[in-house]
Regions:
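Generic structural signal for small/hydrophobic residues in well-ordered secondary structure
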Residues: 2-5, 12, 33, 49-51, ...
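Short aromatic/basic micro-patch
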Residues: 68, 108, 112-113, 144-145
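The feature marks short, hydrophobic/small-residue-biased sequence motifs that occur predominantly
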Residues: 91, 101-133, 137-138
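Mid-to-C-terminal secondary-structure elements
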Residues: 115-132, 142-278
């Protein structure tokens, strides 16, 4: 066939090769988005809550608000769960400026504010030091875990000698408590160059302010199951907690819109009010 019609034969071969390449790319993208790799090794047993819907108990009052998870919701609906291995909440990633104490070395980097549960859910490679603890979160201790790249940029080293040194994060002093290997941006939920504790006092303050009964917030919740076989049990426990929580509210109620989600469901949940049509695996 190649001799009889070389032009069409070449087109056919190239078309077949292109189709195979496209399929391979799609498979690779799927693997990156859904399969576990360090530090997100536990994707297959992690559940996620991105946001909540807030409505009036009296439907005649109308209106619906969508928000990231509030501290009160996280505290009463998720941190009280008995089945999971770990629960964590984190503020959305943001950019910040990190500088040395003499201000001569600096780096603009991505920052995540989170808690001690974060380090149980994700499998970071620590080069030196250790993650911050629950006591650091509760006491508002200014301690940071930084990436290898950030350590090299600020100190020129990424070893034990950096632990206990001071850096400035958005002009506030933090003590370096740990150094981890650099994280790929493809690990979307774990990726940053600096991780610091959120202040429990800030969470409590926002709960007590006029934020729709403390329901509005800026957090996302991660739940690590002991195995994927516990997913249904965890979801049932969450539903029970939400029902109990709604009964305690005066005028409002929350709806998790079928959350918590699996890794794939969370990726496909593009809009707050649209539940992804993905069968449970």
């Amino acid at each position: 066939m190649l001799k009889e019609s070389p032009f069409f034969s070449v087109i056919t071969i190239l078309g077949t090769a292109l189709a195979i390449c496209m399929i391979m790319v799609m498979v690779i993208v799927f693997e990156i988005q859904n399969k576990g790799f360090k530090p997100e090794l536990n994707r297959d047993r992690t559940l996620y809550v991105k946001d909540v819907a807030i409505t009036h108990k009296n439907e005649e009052d109308g209106g619906m608000n969508y928000s990231l998870v509030g501290g009160r919701v996280a505290k009463e609906c998720f941190f009280t769960l008995k089945t999971p291995e770990a629960v964590s909440m984190q503020l959305m990633r943001m950019q910040t400026l990190v500088t040395s104490t003499d201000q001569t070395r600096r780096m603009k980097c991505d920052q995540i504010r989170t808690d001690e549960g974060f380090w149980k859910i994700f499998d970071f490679e620590f080069l030196a030091g250790k993650p911050f603890l629950r006591s650091d979160v509760e006491s508002n201790i200014k301690k940071a875990v930084i990436s290898r790249r950030l350590a090299l940029r600020i100190f020129g080293l990424a070893d034990e000698s950096v632990i206990g040194q001071t850096i400035f994060v958005a002009r506030r002093p933090y003590v370096v408590g740990g150094i981890v290997e650099d994280v790929s941006p493809l690990a979307n939920r774990a990726y940053a160059q600096i991780w610091i504790p959120y202040a429990q006092s800030d969470v409590d303050r926002l709960i007590n302010e006029e934020t729709l009964e403390g329901l509005i917030g800026s957090y996302r919740v991660l739940i690590l199951a002991r195995s994927s076989g516990d997913f249904n049990k965890i979801k049932t426990e969450v539903e029970q907690n939400v029902a109990r929580f709604n009964n305690s509210l005066q005028e409002l109620k929350i709806d998790l819109m079928k959350q918590p989600d699996t890794q794939m469901e969370s990726r496909l949940r593009l809009w707050s009010n649209v539940v992804p049509d993905v069968p449970r695996m």
